[in-house]
A protein has these predicted regions:
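Short, surface-exposed, low-complexity cationic segments
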Residues: 224-239
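Short, acidic, Ser/Thr-enriched surface-loop or helix-capping motifs
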Residues: 211
Length: 254
């Protein structure tokens, strides 16, 4: 069946495509009626569609050639750890022997989310610790039940920030993987948003975080083990190509 676009109407008025999509998203009804135009047919088919909330995909994987798994994490939210676990397990079930985790463009997110994700691959020990302005220290640790034992590469760039740098820093400090790409953003602070009595909000830095070896990456970033730029005029993903080359040359810890 071929679907053709016909300018939709609401209340007898024509709508743009963007307006129609917005109407579907913002409708308070559980179901919406869609009219489908078929090629060569004058009559429209009307069907009711039940609206459901879809969970955003923030961690997804696929198998590349040579039994190399590829797992991209776009953000560390409340969904990340579970989605990572499912994607990681799926790749293992497919016979993965090497893994590339792509954190390029990942702006960070929740400290708890990145720690829950890292607990699936780190050995026993410290994941990250924070120190507030009074010097109070809070540690996040891993019991090391499921340390990764296959060759690992983590892809990063200048937009890899905050919680994504916690991930990168832990992998680097424990020596369980090789970092490939460009120097990360350099956001090593914890911030909270507070609402004032007049309704305005202010964002305050409440703590700094440090990698397992005590490195403060704020305004510095993490330098990759293998540096490779991705030029604006690149016709292929040279960073991923380098990651593939590197991961193929790594020895398994098994």
């Amino acid at each position: 069946m071929v679907h053709h676009w016909r300018k939709p109407k609401a209340g007898g008025k024509g709508l743009s495509l963007n307006d129609a999509v917005g109407l579907l998203k913002n409708s308070e009804n559980d179901t919406v009626t869609l009219s489908i135009e078929r090629e060569g047919e004058a009559d429209l088919i009307e069907t009711e569609v039940t609206k459901e909330k879809l969970a955003a995909i923030v961690a997804d994987g696929k198998m590349l050639d040579d039994k190399i798994g590829y797992l991209a994490i776009s953000e560390f939210t409340g969904l990340t750890s579970e989605q990572f676990q499912k994607a990681y397990q799926s790749l293992q079930d497919q016979g993965m022997e090497r893994l590339i985790i792509d954190l390029r463009g990942n702006p960070g997110g929740l400290v708890t989310a990145v720690c829950d994700t890292l607990r699936q691959i780190l050995p026993e020990g410290l994941i990250v610790y924070t120190e507030d302005t009074n010097g109070k220290r809070e540690e996040y640790t891993c019991d090391g039940d499921t340390p990764i034992s296959i060759p690992l590469v983590v892809l990063v760039n200048e937009n890899t920030a905050s919680a994504a740098e916690i991930f990168t820093g832990a992998v680097k400090d424990y020596g369980i993987g090789t970092i490939v790409g460009t120097t990360t953003f350099g956001k090593g602070i914890v911030q909270n948003t507070f609402q004032l009595s007049d309704g305005s909000v202010v964002k305050l830095t409440i703590a700094h975080y440090y990698t397992p070896l005590g490195n403060d990456i704020h305004k510095v970033g993490i330098t990759p083990d293998v540096e490779v730029e991705l030029p604006d005029d690149a016709t292929s993903d040279v960073q991923l190509e380098k990651a593939l080359e590197v991961v193929k040359g790594l020895e398994s810890a098994e």
